[in-house]
Structures are given as C-alpha cells and as structure tokens.
C-alpha cells in the first residue's frame, strides 16, 4: 500500500514536471517568434530603409540595419527587393558577422507570400521553416512598403539549432 502511494506520488510529480517543461519550451519558442516579428517590424519601419532599399544601397542599409541587428541580438537578417533578390544580408556567427550570403530567397514560401502582397487572417507577415544553405532556419518575413507600394521584404531568422537549444534550456530551468 505504501509503495503504491509512493508510486502514484512520483507519477504525479513526473507528470507535473512534463507539463512545466512543455510550457517552458513553448514559452521559449513564443519569445523567439515575438523577437523575430519585432525585428521585422523595426527594420521595415525604420526611417531610411525604404530609400536605401529603393536605391539598392548595401551601405545605406548596413548603416541602418546593423545597429538593430546587434542591439536586438538577431541571428539572421536579409532585406530583399520586390523581385526577391537580396540587397542586404547579415548573419551572426561565433567570429562576428557573415555578410551577403546568397540563396534563392524568392523561391521560399514565406517570401513568395509577402512579395505577392498576400494577407491571411493574421496579417501580411509570414513564418516558415526553410532549409537554407546555412542550415534549417525559422524565418519571419514581412513587407517593406513605400506608402502603399510594396518595394521588398525583410526576413529575420533563427537557426533551428538555436531554437532547440533555447527550448531545451528553458525546459530544464
């Protein structure tokens, strides 16, 4: 009888820990998604971005975007023109930053939705897991507009390995 009671208590404690771990991991993923969405909005709405993007000015975008990337600790940021061609890109690495890495961004589903001007029930930003040349990455993509005219897109991404590490750390904390 004592061993049954003890086993039930252990089982309930284990279930509680599983629920807590699951909630913590879910919260970690929510924070990553929120940080990405905040980054997309900040970059797309910062003064000078539309002008630098229209001029295809890497230097102009770098002066504006890099401080946002550094201060917000964003892992990956790409700014694309309306055809999906990269105008600016930066990826945080252990050594610093890799710049202007290229990929077929226009073929990626969340980019296609944004550049087509599509909207769903949640708005004009899209999220997708992409098999990028630098590894599986969760991207949030939003439009860059000059008034009502779509002139490009901002992509903010987090490598899947970083997401897994954040979720694991949160669930064991």
PLM feature spans:
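Extracytoplasmic/periplasmic sensor domains and loops in membrane signaling proteins
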Residues: 54-64, 70-73, 91-130, 157, ...
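Amphipathic coiled-coil signal-relay and dimerization helices
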Residues: 43, 85-92, 138-139
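Hydrophobic beta-strand positions
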Residues: 79, 143-144
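A short beta-strand signature within small-molecule sensing/ligand-binding domains used
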Residues: 125-126, 134-143
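Short hydrophobic/glycine-rich mini-motifs in sensory/regulatory modules
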Residues: 144-154
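Juxtamembrane extracytoplasmic/periplasmic/luminal helical "stalk" adjacent to the first N-terminal
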Residues: 1-55, 72-75, 82, 135, ...
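A cross-kingdom signal targeting lumenal/periplasmic-facing segments of multi-pass membrane
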Residues: 80-81, 131
């Amino acid at each position: 009888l004592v061993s049954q009671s003890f086993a039930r208590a252990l089982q309930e404690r284990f279930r509680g820990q599983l629920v807590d771990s699951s909630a913590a991991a879910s919260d970690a993923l929510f924070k990553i998604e929120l940080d990405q969405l905040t980054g997309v909005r900040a970059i797309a709405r910062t003064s000078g971005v539309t002008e630098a993007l229209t001029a295809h000015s890497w230097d102009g975008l770098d002066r504006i975007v890099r401080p946002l990337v550094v201060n917000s600790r964003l892992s990956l940021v790409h700014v694309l023109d309306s055809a999906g061609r990269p105008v600016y890109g930066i990826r945080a690495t252990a050594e610093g930053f890799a710049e202007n890495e290229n990929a077929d961004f226009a073929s990626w589903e969340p980019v296609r939705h944004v550049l087509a001007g599509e909207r769903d029930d949640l708005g004009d930003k899209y999220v997708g897991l992409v098999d990028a040349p630098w590894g599986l990455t969760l991207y949030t993509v939003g439009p860059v507009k000059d008034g009502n005219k779509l002139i490009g897109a901002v992509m903010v991404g987090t490598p899947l390995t970083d997401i897994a590490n954040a979720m694991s750390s949160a669930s064991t904390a």
